Regions:
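Helix-loop boundary and gating motifs at the non-cytosolic
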Residues: 13-62, 227-236, 247
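Helix-to-loop junctions at the C-terminal end of transmembrane segments
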Residues: 68-80, 165, 261-273, 358-359
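Structural signature of the two symmetry-related core transmembrane helices
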Residues: 83-97, 276-290, 371
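Cytoplasmic helix-loop-helix junction between adjacent transmembrane helices
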Residues: 113-149
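Intracellular juxtamembrane helix-capping segments at the cytosolic ends
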Residues: 121-134, 313-327
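Symmetry-related core transmembrane helices of the 12-TM Major Facilitator Superfamily/SLC fold
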Residues: 172-188, 367-382
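C-terminal transmembrane helical hairpin of 12-TM major facilitator-type secondary transporters
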Residues: 275-317
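A late C-terminal transmembrane helix in Major Facilitator Superfamily
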Residues: 330-359
Length: 393
């Protein structure tokens, strides 16, 4: 799926402490990020803001993710990945404190944008370190563990609001403390982190799009699928007579499958290859879309939703594995930044595109749009596999 030789690995010894530290860092960071989205929405809702304004405010953070993606490779080369990651953790804590101090939507627009801008480099750098340190023989399972724990962190974030509430400083202090803890863990593990090589041959994020377009389309597909489904499944379910409680429970099962099955998918990738597993994930996701209208009223929808969530996000996990198989050094960093760009773009584009199809043909536009997206990816991956097997002339 890409056009660069795989990096060579000098040792198969796994730096367990360093990998555990990076996973813990990103998990804590994800909890704080997952807490901030619903917390700020609750506050704006109490202030009487319209759903449209609340949505625009929430979009500032992913917009910050997208914009920062173009700067991460250069900033990493200029200041070093370690310094950049530490600065981002500290800046995120300060920005969340500023958001807590000035609870005004107009002030929050730039602050939430900057929060996304600061958060994205930490994810990109952490994923780059994670991929670089993972021995090839264990990369599938390790990236599965990483993906599962990050997803769990985002899921745990909103649950903390049930414990500390959504008013006053307590929820903000939880988020700020998480960002500070993230920086402390980073400080502890930084001496064990690998250095990025190939720094004399920088590649831009835009240039990486030409190097690995199918990989980036896979990331776009995973993000558009997830965000489109989460945003519009309530509309689809209500049109089919499902209660709000049942719809919420099905979405919870969808997310649970995402969290639970990334490790088995990673293990399968080690046996048969990440590209083949990505093809299976895309096909199963498309089949799930086709079965949705039939299975939604039945009990079979529950196990299907569980597997559906796993394979939908599994597309992204397989993309990370392939990124590590084909790139190293500064190209790996640039590739991860391009992944962040593709994820942010897919996450923003997915709901309106899917919603437009629903407006045109009715509620069945949701599974149709998502199935077409996954089907297009499956065709691209299949063509890539066939071309790889074709003998060179």
């Amino acid at each position: 799926m890409t056009a660069e030789n795989p990096p060579t690995t000098e040792s198969s010894v796994m730096p367990v402490a360093a990998i555990a530290g990076i996973i813990a860092t990103v998990a804590v960071f994800a909890i704080s990020q997952g807490l901030s989205y619903p917390l700020l929405s609750f506050i704006l809702q109490r202030q009487g803001l319209s759903p449209a304004m609340i949505g625009v405010s929430a979009a500032m953070t992913p917009l910050g993710f997208i914009v920062s993606s173009f700067f991460i490779p250069a900033l990493s080369r200029q200041f070093g990945a370690a310094r950049l990651a530490l600065a981002c953790a500290a800046l995120a804590a300060l920005l969340l404190a500023a958001i807590a101090t000035r609870q005004d939507i107009w002030t929050w627009f730039p602050l939430r944008f900057l929060l996304g801008f600061a958060a994205n480099p930490l994810y990109v750098i952490s994923e780059t370190w994670m991929i670089a340190m993972a021995p090839p023989a264990k990369r599938g399972r390790l990236m599965g563990i990483y993906a599962s724990i990050v997803s769990a962190g985002f899921a745990i974030g909103p649950l903390t609001l049930a414990l500390v509430g959504t008013e006053g400083w307590p929820p903000f202090l939880v988020g700020i403390s998480a960002f500070v803890l993230c920086g402390a863990i980073l400080l502890a593990v930084l001496p064990r982190m690998p250095e990025m090589q190939d720094e004399k041959q920088p590649t831009s994020v835009a240039g990486f799009v030409l190097v690995a377009p199918l990989l980036l389309f896979a990331v776009f597909t995973a993000a558009a699928f997830e965000q489109g489904l989460l945003a519009l499944f309530s509309v689809y379910g209500a049109a089919h007579g499902s209660s709000e409680q049942r719809i919420s429970a099905l979405l919870t099962v969808f997310i649970a499958g995402n969290v639970a099955l990334q490790i088995p998918l990673g293990a399968l990738a080690e046996r048969v290859g990440a590209t083949r597993v990505m093809l299976l994930c895309a096909l199963f996701a498309a089949v799930g879309c086709a079965l949705l209208p039939v299975l939604l009223p039945t009990l079979l929808i529950w196990p299907v939703a569980f597997v559906w969530g796993a394979v939908a996000f599994g597309i992204y996990t397989m993309g990370l594995i392939q990124l590590g198989e084909n790139f190293s050094g500064s190209m790996l960093m640039t590739g991860n930044a391009a992944f962040a760009l593709a994820w942010g773009t897919g996450g923003i584009a997915g709901p309106p595109l899917t919603g437009t199809v629903m407006d045109l043909i009715g509620v069945q536009g949701l599974p149709l749009a998502l199935a077409l997206l996954c089907g297009a990816l499956a065709v691209g991956v299949f063509v890539s596999l066939v071309s790889q097997r074709r003998p060179a002339r």
